UniProtKB/Swiss-Prot annotation:
Family: Belongs to the dUTPase family.
Keywords: Hydrolase, Magnesium, Metal-binding, Nucleotide metabolism
General function of this protein: This enzyme is involved in nucleotide metabolism: it produces dUMP, the immediate precursor of thymidine nucleotides and it decreases the intracellular concentration of dUTP so that uracil cannot be incorporated into DNA.
Protein name, per record: Deoxyuridine 5'-triphosphate nucleotidohydrolase
Coiled coil region boundaries: none
Chain's gene name: dut
Classification via CDD domains: trimeric_dUTPase
Associated pathway: Pyrimidine metabolism; dUMP biosynthesis; dUMP from dCTP (dUTP route): step 2/2
Obligatory cofactor(s): Mg(2+)
Listed EC numbers: 3.6.1.23
Gene3D superfamilies xref list: 2.70.40.10
Cross-referenced PANTHER family: DEOXYURIDINE 5'-TRIPHOSPHATE NUCLEOTIDOHYDROLASE (PTHR11241:SF0)
């Protein structure tokens, strides 16, 4: 597995992201809070991480939910995956939502999401009058599962 140089800046005292196992695809992001807060069922909040990154051109970072929080507490990300573009230099924030039935306390330093790095290509759009035919055609949602 190769490595990607990513410049990172701590905006507050917060743990640096780390891979938790040898072959983990993502690093954990932690909440960087001055005080814990409660996320009520159905409520969402932007949770700061205290981190900013500089990605090389041609890469993005994807912010994804943690499966354990989803399974045990119904905690998810509203926009999953969230995209961090290579030219973004602000603080990484995570939009959490409580889809569970119980209030959930978000604590400072708690692992709230994971971040995965990926190459990305820029599309060059070529406007045409017709698109090529396929067996699927315009079959949409649920089409391949019938």
């Amino acid at each position: 597995m190769g490595s990607l140089p990513v410049r990172i800046k701590r905006l507050r005292a917060t743990p640096l992201p780390a891979y938790m196992t040898e072959h983990a695809a993502g690093v954990d992001l932690c909440a960087s809070l001055s005080a814990d807060f409660v996320l009520a069922p159905g409520e969402r909040a932007l949770v700061p991480t205290g981190l900013a990154i500089e990605l090389p051109p041609g890469f993005e970072a994807q912010v994804r939910p943690r499966s354990g929080l989803a399974l045990r507490h119904g905690i998810a990300l509203v926009n999953s995956p969230g995209t961090i573009d290579a030219d973004y230099r602000g603080e990484i924030g995570v939009i959490l939502i409580n889809l569970g039935s119980e209030p959930f306390t978000v604590s400072d330093g708690e692992r709230i999401a994971q971040m995965v790095f990926a190459r990305c290509e820029r599309a060059e759009f070529i406007e045409v009058d017709e698109l090529g035919d396929t067996a699927r055609g315009a079959g949409g949602f649920g089409h391949t599962g019938r």
